[in-house]
Design a protein with these regions (language model features):
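Histidine-acidic metal/acid-base catalytic patches
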Residues: 2-35, 63, 103, 158-177, ...
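Hydrophobic alpha-helical packing residues
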Residues: 58, 95, 134, 266, ...
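Conserved beta-strand positions in the central sheet of alpha/beta enzyme cores
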Residues: 38, 71-73, 108, 146, ...
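Short, solvent-exposed loop/turn segments at secondary-structure boundaries
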Residues: 48-52, 81-86, 118-123, 186-189, ...
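Active-site acidic/histidine proton-transfer and metal-coordination neighborhood
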Residues: 20-27, 60-65, 80-175, 183-184, ...
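N-terminal small/glycine-rich loop or linker at the start of catalytic domains
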Residues: 2-12, 68-79, 111-114
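Active-site-proximal loop/turn and secondary-structure-junction residues that shape catalytic pockets
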Residues: 17-19, 41-43, 75-78, 111-115, ...
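Glycine-rich, proline-tolerant flexible connector loops at the mouths of alpha/beta enzymes
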Residues: 39-62, 112-118
Length: 282
């Protein structure tokens, strides 16, 4: 029985950080206590590029294994802002189709890259135009977009994330919180971002990093204020998803993704944080 002081959050994770094969992804996540998976790719193919047959096969595998999908981790908006609006609208429709086939409510997106010599303020209107177009599609498709604060996109610092959310003003656009990404752009996540973004925060991406060199480390071992954030989210009544996105391959020499070993390290590190905060993950 969960103590009265505890709450429960649904644990998920980026399956393709474990292996290209979704069967392996599911097995490892379930062994770590997760009942959800965040789908970015399967069989080495990005989610927006999977064929109808591949999507159907993936849906069948998930159903067979009793695994649900927390979000579609799409690449939408992770392109230069100079591309036409329609470029990402078309890809979002494919992501929305994948969400429907796999039974997911959320689609992770970004707010566009821009050239090194381009002043960030000069692209603001173009970004807002594109984000409004994406939100309109999301409303039409019945999904919710989660903006991730990726390093070097327009919305990589709290004020610009808030500007996007408030300017678009759509129930279909919310915030995915990534503490490591904030650290990598010099932001103190809890002190400088939490209060501003909490009203719109609907999804937690579990990643930590160091201010000194930007390296990603297991949750609670960096400067991302993971414990304070989890404690505050618990106090605020957050009951959403916590999705493991370790990015630990470099630290553990496992190649292009975390792999099962580093993913397990990441999961156990986050379990220590949640246990200290009185949060149970299921």
């Amino acid at each position: 029985m969960v103590p009265a002081t505890q709450v429960s959050w649904a644990l998920s994770g980026f399956g393709d950080e474990i292996d290209d094969d979704p069967a392996v992804q599911i097995a490892v996540l379930q062994a770590l206590g997760a009942s959800y998976i965040e789908v970015r790719s399967a069989w080495g193919t990005n989610i927006v590029d999977l064929s109808d047959d591949q999507l159907a096969a993936l849906a069948g595998l998930l159903k067979e294994k009793g695994m649900q999908v927390s979000a579609i981790a799409s690449p939408i908006g992770k392109v230069d802002v100079s591309l036409p609006v329609e470029h990402e609208v078309e890809r979002l429709r494919r992501a929305a189709n994948a969400a429907k086939v796999l039974g997911a409510k959320y689609i992770r997106i970004f707010s566009f890259y821009y050239g090194e010599s381009v002043p960030v303020d000069s692209i603001r209107d173009a970004v807002i135009e594109r984000m409004r177009a994406l939100a309109a599609v999301a409303e039409e498709e019945g999904v919710v977009l989660l903006h991730e604060n990726e390093k070097d996109i327009f919305g990589d610092v709290p004020d610009r994330v808030l500007d996007i959310i408030e300017s678009v003003n759509s129930p279909a656009l919310k915030v995915a919180w990534d503490a490591a990404n904030f650290v990598q752009v010099g932001v103190k996540p809890f002190d400088e971002a939490y209060a501003k973004l909490r009203p719109h925060l609907e999804y937690l991406q579990v990643k930590d990093a160091l201010f000194s060199n930007g390296h990603v480390v297991p949750a609670g071992e960096g400067d991302g204020d993971l414990l304070r954030t989890v404690e505050a989210l618990k106090a605020d009544g957050f009951t959403g998803f916590a999705s493991l996105e370790p990015h630990l391959a470099g630290a553990h020499g496992l190649g292009g993704f975390s792999g099962p070993t580093a993913f397990g390290i990441a999961a156990r590190a986050f379990a220590k944080v949640t246990a200290e905060a009185g949060v149970q993950t299921v």
